[in-house]
Amino acid sequence: MQNEIQFKDENHKNMYHTLLKKCNRADEETKPVMYLLALTCNLSRAKQMFDFKEMCIRPDNFEQPWQTSSSARAIRLAFVLWNGFPTAEQHELNSVYNIFGYSSWDKYFIEAIKLRYPTTC
């Protein structure tokens, strides 16, 4: 029996389902990215960070003025879970040390990892 996904609130849950429908797939790569985008973004911001037509992350848009330290950590983790993203200059920022431990969202970060690796977690 699979555990129920933990959401921050009803808005997080609704946005997660909206984003999953928008990308038309719900696999182990997509779910954690949509989960983390839903945690931190509204639909227009999620579109800045993820190309739903091409089904790819948009790291070129990472430095948006609306980013907070928590949203930046969530999106960095989403990108890492998508494809191991870090560029050479962002490698240190994407370390476990720099993503976890600074945010009240850590429990949601763990939830995203569970979505990505359901048979391991």
Question: Locations of the language-model features?
Answer:
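Extended, charge-biased low-complexity segments
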Residues: M1-T68, R76, N83-C121
